Each structure stands twice: as C-alpha cells, then as structure tokens.
From Swiss-Prot:
InterPro entries: ATP-grasp, ATP-grasp_succ-CoA_synth-type, ATP_grasp_subdomain_1, Succ-CoA_synthase_bsu_CS, SUCC_ACL_C, Succ_CoA_ligase-like_bsu, Succinyl-CoA_synth-like. Heterotetramer of two alpha and two beta subunits. PROSITE patterns: ATP_GRASP (PS50975), SUCCINYL_COA_LIG_3 (PS01217). The gene is sucC. Its EC number is 6.2.1.5. This is Succinate--CoA ligase [ADP-forming] subunit beta. Belongs to the succinate/malate CoA ligase beta subunit family. Mg(2+) binds at residues 199, 213. GO terms for cellular component: cytosol; succinate-CoA ligase complex. Keywords: ATP-binding, Ligase, Magnesium, Metal-binding, Nucleotide-binding, Tricarboxylic acid cycle.
C-alpha cells in the first residue's frame, strides 16, 4: 500500500526525522489559509498522487504569491496528472501539499528496500540526489552505495557513518546522517514497510540534513497489524478493478494488453501470461482466483476482467487440484449468461472433474472455445483477440 508524501512525512516526524511543517489542502481556501501559517515568502506546492515524476510533469512548483497559489490549485485540483510512472489516464489529484521552500546546498539520495536474494533489508545511498535512481545505477553505478542490515542486530550506527563517509559528508553531518539512517531502519521494521525512499535528502545552507521528499510503501500482507496505516489508504489512487477484486479475495493486477486471463494459482497465472506473449499476444491482466475458487468468485472474476474495454478475448486456464473444474465451468456459464459476454472465451480445464466441466461447457450452447492444451489455448486466444480488433 502506497502512502502520500504528506502521510509519509507524518511518519517521519513521529520517528524524529527532520521534515518541514506543511499543510495538505483540498481547496483554494485551505491553501490561502496555509500560506499565512507557513514561514517564508515562497512555498512549494506538490500534487499528491501515488506516482513519481511529478516534478517533470508540472505537478511540483515554487509558488511566490497568493495569486500563484490560487492559479496552481485551480489548474490541478480535480484533474489527473500524467507522469512517466502512470498510465495514459494519469492519477487523480484531490489534495495538494504546501510547505516552505528550503535553501538547498546539495541533494543526496537514500532508500531502503527488501532484497529478495539476500532476504535482508538493504539501504542504498548516492551523492546524486534528485535524479531517477535507475539512471544513476545505469550510468554511474560507482556512485550508488549499499549497506545490508543484519536482522539479528539491526541497523548499526557505524553502518550509517560508513555511508556518510562515502557520500562525502563531514563534521556534524556524519552523526546526523547516522541518526537518520538508524531511525529509518527502525521505522522500516516496526511498520512492516517494503520500500522507503528519500529523494532528495538535502544538505541545507546551514549544513543540516533534511528530508525534502518522502516515499513509503507498506507491505499489504502486514496491514492487519497496522490499523493506523490502513486508515491512510487512498482508494482513489488505486485501480477500481483491483480494489473490487480484493473484496472477493482475488489477486488482480491490471496490465495494458487485450487478452483477459483467469487462472488458479500465481505460478500458473504467470506461465499463462508468458505463453500468451510467446505466441504474440498481450495479457490484459494477472488474475489468480486461488485454490478455493467458487462459482461466485469466478463470476466476479469475469465481471472484473470485462470492465476493461481493451479486452478482446478471455483465456480461462484452470488446473483442478483443490478446486473442482465442474464448479469453475458452472461459474463461467453463469457469468456469461448474467453479464452477456460479447468477446470470445477460450477455456482450458485440466484435473479434478475436468471431463464433467467440459461437458457442462458443451451443454451450455454458449460461444465458448474449449481446448485441451495450454499451447492451443494461447494460440486460440491470440487469434481471437486479433480477429476482434
């Protein structure tokens, strides 16, 4: 689950990290009231969306007067911001964050992620802050420094000092950086985060370190332990299909293709998408109905897939281990009868009660294409999608 910048900074402040006092505003009146409370004669206005690249898209701007604040809010509030990290529709803007401008001497980069290969938390830091870290890693990898956290002892101050030296910090900055490093590690573990990023972490003109930006992603699987974080969830920033799928315990991820996929099991779902790509097709989604799929869940899965107007064909690939293929078949028939599916549906059933499931599909007199192998299913789906365009 992603947090907005202002929510992330609230977390940072709770852990004693250096952040400015800002105000999140939902209308022009709140914004004009906020700048009266903020210090300085110019401020930063930041559109709050769950995506990076806001600055390059115009969603972050220095505003120097009440009129500029009014113009910025009028232009962006209620609109959608398209960045390099969003789709072509962009993300809706319902809130804008206002904070004082900072006098910056230098920009740094600091983040923490879970490294799957080492199964440890890894901190990454660079003297090239304010840039896309992927670009730094590609063009100047020697400027990206890493520290791995031992889960038995946690983050140690000496590790923070080592990073500080590599970043070229000196004097009191080293001690301050080490404190920031240790507190971020504590925050990461205690709040069950999967990603934490400060870009940029700046050195101010007074030589103090400051968290100018904040990005936090919470592990969805741990949200039950953090009702305070779950209450921060902004459903307007999420794909409505993914939110609806979550209600039915369906694992759904929207993609940009035209072949809808409904599969049981994450591994089989990924394999299905791979074989669609292998035959020249483009998956429209990842959808795992799970091992305990029921007729009702299959119906809802169909509804969710077909809310995507880009879908030109649907491939159903079910291996009946725990789940019974006849129940899946009944769900498919019920869904098509209820929704009125107009795109070709290719079905491959294998495993428990597969023959009975195929018989149910055959007796339905619906426009279903039943196949025996995954290769044939992919070929049929790709061809059907091309013919429907």
């Amino acid at each position: 689950m992603n947090l907005h910048e202002y929510q992330s900074k609230k977390l940072f402040a709770d852990y004693g990290l250096p952040v400015t006092k800002g105000y999140v505003c939902e209308n022009v009146e709140q914004a004009l009231s906020a700048i009266e409370k903020l210090s300085g004669s110019q401020w930063i206005a930041k559109c709050q969306i769950h995506a990076g690249g806001r600055g390059k898209a115009g969603g972050v701007k220095v505003v120097k007067s009440a009129q500029e604040v009014r113009s910025f809010f009028t232009k962006f509030l209620g609109q959608r911001l398209v960045t390099v990290q969003t789709n072509e529709q962009g993300q809706p803007i319902h809130q804008i964050y206002l904070e004082p401008c900072a006098e910056i001497q230098k920009e740094l980069y600091l983040s923490a992620i879970i490294d799957r290969s080492s199964q440890r938390i890894v901190f990454m830091a660079s003297s090239e802050g304010g840039m896309d870290i992927e670009e730094v890693a590609e063009k100047t990898p020697h400027l990206l420094h890493r520290v791995t956290i031992d889960p038995l002892v946690g983050a140690m101050p000496y590790q923070g000092r080592e990073l500080a030296f590599k970043l070229g910090l000196s004097g009191k900055q080293i001690q301050q950086f080490s404190q920031i490093f240790c507190q971020l590690a504590k925050l990461f573990v205690e709040k069950d985060l999967s990603l934490l990023e400060i870009n940029p972490l700046v050195i101010l003109k007074n030589d103090e370190l400051f968290c100018l930006d904040a990005k936090v992603v919470v592990d969805d699987n741990a949200l039950y332990r953090h009702p305070d974080l779950f209450s921060m969830r902004d459903l307007t920033q999420e794909d409505p299909r993914e939110a609806e799928a979550e209600k039915w315990n369906l694992n759904y991820v929207a993609l940009d293709g035209n072949i809808g996929c409904m599969v049981n099991g994450a591994g089989l779902a990924m394999g299905t998408m791979d074989i669609i790509k292998l035959h020249g097709g483009r998956p429209a989604n990842f959808l795992d109905v799970g091992g305990g799929a029921t007729k009702e869940r299959v119906m809802e899965a169909f509804k969710i897939i077909l809310t995507d107007s880009a879908v030109k064909a649907v491939l159903v690939n079910i291996f009946g281990g725990i789940v019974r293929c006849d129940l899946i078949a009944k769900g498919i028939v019920s869904a098509i009868n209820e929704i009125g599916v107009s795109v070709p549906v290719i079905v491959r059933l294998e495993g428990t009660n597969a023959d009975l499931g195929c018989e149910i599909l055959a007796q339905s007199n619906l426009n279903l294409i039943a196949v025996n192998s995954l290769t044939e299913a992919a070929e049929q789906a790709v061809n059907a999608a091309k013919e429907s365009e």
